[in-house]
Every structure is written in C-alpha cells, then in structure tokens.
Amino acid sequence: AVYLLVCKKHGERKMKYKLLAADMDATALNSKKELTPANVNAMEKAIAQGKTVVFSTGRSISLVKPYIDMVRGMRYAVTGSGASVIDTQTGKKFLYETIDPETVKYIAARAAGYVMPIFFIDDKTYSSAWCVDNCADFGLSAYEPIYRKGMNIVDDAFAMFMADPKPVEK
C-alpha cells in the first residue's frame, strides 16, 4: 500500500520490491476520492526508482484512467476486482475475464429493482440515471461526481443489457 512509502512515523522504507499495487478507495484516495499530492509523489518516486506501480481496484478502466493520468509513468491497472489487467498506454489486456451474457441475464432479471445496476462492458461502465441521481440512497454520495464523469449513464441499465447482452467484466 502507498502508506509504506510515506509513513510519517517510520520515514521512508527501503524495501526490495518490484511492484506496488495500490487499492484506490481508503488507500491511495482520501475520503473525498482525491489522489493526494503526497501519494502522487510517492508513486512517482517509486516509478523513478524502476518500480512498477499499479492501481488495483474494483473499478473499471473508465473510472480509473483519470487517476492514472495524474501519476507520471503509471502504465498498468488491475481493474474489475482482478477481472482485467491492462496496459493503459497501449490498451493491451494481459488478462480479461468476463461473465457470460446468459449468466448475467439470469442475475439481472432477479436483481432488477433491488440493486444499483453497474455493468462493466468493453472497458466502459454503465448505470441507470435514477441510480446515479440517488447515490446517497446507496451510501455512495462521494462517488457521484466520479460516476457522472466516467460512467455511461443510461435510462435503464438492466433494459439496455437485456436488449443487447454482452460479456460483462463485473
């Protein structure tokens, strides 16, 4: 985690690691979902020392890319809770695991009306407008600006998927 690089109590640590994988929420990002200058500096310092630094997150690449662009030299991302490993500079996917459309249709048919639908399809994130408009009802107020900036907001995400089912990353 990033805190190993900027720990105030112990100072900078000398570790023989080659990869730093940082979770985003409550690790690399503060409570306002911002990437702090201290963490950007720590990540860039590690990259300058020849380390590979990646975000490892449950988010899709469309919701991670703005943060990656803030860290000079960050190239890779582990997204969708491990469903995808992407070279963000070339778009090459080293790993891309999806859930087949029939399984997603089965789940979606039973979940409609009970959950906030968020579909990760082809590196894009989709959700229903009513969900994004009511993020607070889901305990996700802090995410609303991120969703509005990085999601494809549609009238009804379940209906969109059912009309044109595709493999889903998450």
Residue map of PLM features:
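Short, Lys/Arg-enriched N-terminal segments with co-localized hydrophobic residues
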Residues: A1-K14
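Alpha-helix termination/capping residues and helix-transition junctions
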Residues: K14, M70-V71, P165
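Asp-based phosphoryl-transfer active-site loop
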Residues: Y17-K32
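Active-site phosphate-binding/coordination module
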Residues: P37-S141
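Short, solvent-exposed beta-strand edge segments and adjacent coil->beta transition regions
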Residues: G91-F94, K166-K170
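Acidic, His- and aromatic-enriched active-site or binding-groove loops in soluble protein domains
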Residues: C135-A159
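Alpha-helix-centered segments that form part of catalytic cores
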Residues: D155-E169
